A protein has these predicted regions:
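Pair of pore-lining "gating" transmembrane helices in MFS-fold secondary transporters
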Residues: 8-36, 40, 108-109
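Residue-level signature of mid-helix packing/kink "hotspots" within the transmembrane helices
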Residues: 29, 56-65, 148-149
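Cytoplasmic helix-loop-helix junction between adjacent transmembrane helices
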Residues: 106-142
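Conserved MFS/SLC helix-loop-helix module at the cytosolic interface between two early adjacent transmembrane helices
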Residues: 62-101
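Small-residue hotspots at the loop-to-helix junctions and early N-terminal turns
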Residues: 43-50, 138
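Small-residue (Gly/Pro/Ala) motifs that create kinks and tight helix-helix packing interfaces
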Residues: 35, 67, 147-159, 163, ...
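Short hydrophobic/aromatic, small-residue-rich stretches within specific transmembrane helices
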Residues: 21, 50-57
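Symmetry-related core transmembrane helices of the 12-TM Major Facilitator Superfamily/SLC fold
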Residues: 166-179
Length: 179
């Protein structure tokens, strides 16, 4: 992360962290409003689709067990870069695939990517919160919520005229470039 004074929380740092949380919410919630399109791409029944969706938890649980050590070793900034790149790639694959097997692999990897990003961003924020002696994480989670809401609004506006593949690919590339 950028070097800021450890004893104070500057507005530029608040802005950077808000962008990080906003973009995280925007990206990881982008598939939720398009789940009917994901199911249609896979041509599976509801039970199978629910099972396929739940496989992301495998990657998430594994990363929750080892993510702290990874972030400690490579740093929060690098972990967020890796996480955001992996989220972008796996979400693009999820939006394009018609194969349940490919979907499972991408889903597991996306769960891991989301977890490492979350561990790195929240861990860094909690560390800064301790350093400056101010509660800052609730506002940043508010930025995450605004990003998630923006993702739903984008999906509402484009779903009728834009395929899930174009929608998610475009959004992931834009978010990744900004991140």
């Amino acid at each position: 992360m950028k070097n800021f004074k450890t004893s104070e929380f500057q507005s530029v740092e608040r802005r950077y962290l808000s962008y990080i949380f906003f973009l995280f919410g925007l990206s990881i919630m982008s598939l939720a409003p398009r789940t009917p399109d994901l199911k249609a791409n896979l041509n599976v029944n509801n039970g199978t689709f629910g099972t396929l969706l739940s496989t992301a938890s495998i990657g998430s649980i594994v990363m929750l067990l080892i993510g702290g050590q990874i972030v400690h070793r490579i740093g929060a900034k690098r972990a967020m870069q890796i996480g955001s790149t992996a989220v972008a790639i796996t979400y693009i694959v999820l939006a394009h695939t018609k194969s349940p097997f490919v979907f499972v692999v991408a889903s597991i990897l996306s769960g891991a990517a989301i977890s490492i990003y979350h561990i790195a961003s929240s861990g860094h924020t909690l560390h800064r919160q301790d350093q400056v002696g101010k509660i800052i994480i609730p506002k940043l989670h508010g930025a995450w919520g605004i990003g998630a809401l923006a993702s739903s609004a984008i999906a509402f506006l484009v779903a009728a005229n834009v395929s899930i593949a174009w929608h998610i690919t475009t959004l992931m590339v834009v978010v990744w470039v900004i991140t």
